[in-house]
């Protein structure tokens, strides 16, 4: 299910085509939005983009892990991790696209 990777340049090009800003302004807009999201997350704020997702930092306590090769117990230090939780709207869009893609593939196989 490997697909195309969307880059900052792709986002800027999309803004350029849809909004009508110059390519430079579009790239600056994309950078500014990404910077704002990163800064908010770094400050420990929750970033909620309605109908898309929520990003937040979560504290993970120290725990005991295991070396898979030796089976030896290894302490894993406490740390902060970023979590991404897709909204229900995004989940439904993904499911709908997946279902449509599967139906299309099934139709192509039947026509062969």
UniProtKB/Swiss-Prot annotation:
UniProt entry keywords in alphabetical sequence: DNA recombination, DNA-binding, Transcription, Transcription regulation, Translation regulation
Gene3D superfamilies, alphabetized: IHF-like DNA-binding proteins (4.10.520.10)
Any one Pfam family match given in the protein's UniProt record, by short name: Bac_DNA_binding
GO biological process: DNA recombination; positive regulation of metabolic process; regulation of DNA-templated transcription; regulation of translation
GO molecular function: DNA binding; structural constituent of chromatin
Record GO cellular component, one term: cytosol
Top-level taxonomic group: Bacteria
Alphabetized InterPro entries for the sequence: Hist_DNA-bd, Histone-like_DNA-bd_CS, IHF-like_DNA-bd_dom_sf, IHF_alpha
Similarity comment: Belongs to the bacterial histone-like protein family.
HAMAP family per the UniProt record, alphabetical: IHF_alpha
PANTHER family according to UniProt: DNA-BINDING PROTEIN HU, INTEGRATION HOST FACTOR SUBUNIT ALPHA
Subunit relationships: Heterodimer of an alpha and a beta chain.
Function statement: This protein is one of the two subunits of integration host factor, a specific DNA-binding protein that functions in genetic recombination as well as in transcriptional and translational control.
Name this polypeptide is given: Integration host factor subunit alpha
Organism of provenance: Agrobacterium fabrum (strain C58 / ATCC 33970) (Agrobacterium tumefaciens (strain C58))
Lineage: Bacteria, Pseudomonadati, Pseudomonadota, Alphaproteobacteria, Hyphomicrobiales
